[in-house]
Amino acid sequence: MIMSKDEYLITDAPLKALTVFAMPMILGSFFQQIYNMADSIIVGQFVGSSALAAVGACAALTNVFICVALGAGVGAGVLVSRYFGARDYGKMKTIVSTSLISFLVLSILLGIFGFCFSHSMMSLLQTPADILDEAVLYLRVYFVGFPFLFMYNILSTMFTSIGESRIPLVLLIFSSVLNIFMDLWMVAGLGLGVFGAALATLIAQGISAVFSFLIFLYRMRRYKCQFEWFDGQELYSMLQIAIPSVLQQSTVSIGMMIVQAVVNPFGTQALAGYSATMRVENVFSLIFVSIGNAISPYISQNLGAKKIERLKKGYHAALVLDICFAVLAFLVIESLHNQISSLFLGKDGTALAYQVSGDYMRWLGYFFIFMGIKMATDGVLRGLGIMRPFLIANMVNLAIRLSVALICAPRFGIAFVWLAVPAGWLANFLISYAALRKSWPNEEDKGAISCRKY
């Protein structure tokens, strides 16, 4: 039987294994946000707050399409991890091939759709007229490179599903550094403005995606076995997990677009402040997302290997990591929120922009712990393949956030856009945890565990 050096998720002590696995993913999330924030910081400093607002206005919409990629990767990743843990490498490679072919086609279709309807979508979001043209330009360049972004996210999920989180980190560092230098050259040097920022991101992401694909192909040569290039039945099994995850992630992002539409009427400066803190929220939230993404393959691999006793220990290890990072987030935001806001808003930012950014940021800092425990619990549910309560919990989270923003913010002020966020996280956790307590497999379940569906 083939043995793999990546099997530490099913052999090492749970806290050690999860920490070793999660840390590159956390660092990767940090560099992913540097990669994203480079556009905002450089545009804000060298072009102005209106250009920053144009880039920020695109964030909620681009997140919808990114979440489709991430959700699609979840379906493939859970099954790849399960077969990897069971050492059924033929099925594992069939899932990999089937998902890459299917999602490449999907990414091209989504890119064409996004490019053609960029103006219509930004108009529906009530984007302020003074930044609409720049926002549409940024968005269209983004969609030209969308297949690269989509496939890079799928490949990153594939790497982590087999216990490899270092290669995505190295590629992210490379693309982040490249993106920053190209941003400075195209925006500050050549004066290309929003177009230059978008083009720099496209080129850096494209190079990273190509390298990811070549390295992953080489990595798969380690597992010498027969497999099918495309299997409709495995695609169906994958979609049973992927579709709820895509619905959850894309619906939440659509909800954020609706929230953005609530913010937009408050004006360009309020939008600039909101956009600045959204970037900061993404930095810290992706730390917790990374821990949740790390626990999913841990759970799935150990389930495939029928090591039931390790599941709860892994969940507890994830909670420990979440608590540590929640405390760190609070300390950083409480101490440096003004300086962080100035990175994005620059000298052109008004008092309103700084107030919106600071108030939103400090409120989040108090309650990131709720996001952390929510993400860990959701990650365990994904690893077990229990998607219905996972979807319901996230929809409740979204409903709370949307209802308060839509009803209260227009009447009582922009602060109500973010006041309900922690309540949504907490409700999500409670629903997910209740479902998890009912669904934990035990030692008596070993014989009934299937690699296709738990």
Briefly describe each language-model feature range.
Residues 30, 34-52, 122-129, 185-192, ...:
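Helix-terminus/linker motif at the lipid-water interface of multi-pass membrane proteins
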Residues 1-22, 80-145, 189-243, 299-366, ...:
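Short alpha-helical transmembrane segments in multi-pass integral membrane proteins
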